[in-house]
């Protein structure tokens, strides 16, 4: 299990680029939506997440969690995975993807070695947030 092998970090990583603020996390982090909400509130518009879900968690959770993190925060969420090596000791799910602020995939691969290309439209983030102002309607005093 990942939590038995890796040590958790102590800080949130957000890169301030000329394009936008980019949050960076790793595989197991995707299970904690609060992390990505904090990144979003700090101004992140894109999250990059390398991950290597296996053939149990991948089919059940990969698409769902990546789309949910994008939708919940109305951001772009790019998750990259190793290609599946059927001869290797670890069977990665693969399926690298980019989800948009509406929770749809705008770039996706399968389990083979490949490259994902996706358009990251920062104006689309604002369009979605204006249509459905989730961040403005939060009630942090209640929860």
Regions found by a protein language model. Give the residues of each.
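C-terminal beta-strand edge segments of enzyme domains
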Residues: 82-143
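Aromatic- and carboxylate-lined catalytic core of secreted/periplasmic carbohydrate-active enzymes
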Residues: 73
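Short, Asp-centered acidic motifs that coordinate Mg2+ and/or phosphate
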Residues: 46, 76
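Short secondary-structure boundary segments
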Residues: 51-52, 80-83
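Active-site catalytic loop in hydrolytic enzyme cores
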Residues: 1-42, 55-64, 68, 131-134
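Structural beta-sheet core signal
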Residues: 24, 77-79, 98
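Short gly/pro/ser/thr-enriched loop/turn and capping motifs at secondary-structure boundaries
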Residues: 54-57, 85-87
């Amino acid at each position: 299990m990942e939590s038995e092998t890796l040590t958790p970090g102590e800080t949130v990583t957000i890169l301030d680029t000329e394009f936008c603020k980019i949050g960076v996390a790793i595989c197991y982090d995707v299970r904690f939506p609060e992390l990505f909400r904090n990144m979003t509130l700090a101004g992140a518009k894109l999250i990059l997440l390398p991950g290597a879900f296996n053939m149990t968690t991948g089919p059940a959770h990969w698409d769902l969690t990546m789309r949910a993190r994008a939708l919940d925060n109305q951001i772009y969420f790019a998750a990259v995975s190793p290609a599946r090596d059927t001869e290797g000791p670890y069977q990665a799910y693969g399926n690298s993807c980019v989800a948009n602020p509406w929770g749809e995939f705008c770039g996706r691969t399968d389990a083979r070695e490949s490259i994902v290309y996706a358009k990251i439209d920062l104006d689309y983030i604002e369009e979605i947030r204006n249509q459905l102002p989730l961040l403005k309607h939060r009630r942090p005093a209640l929860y």
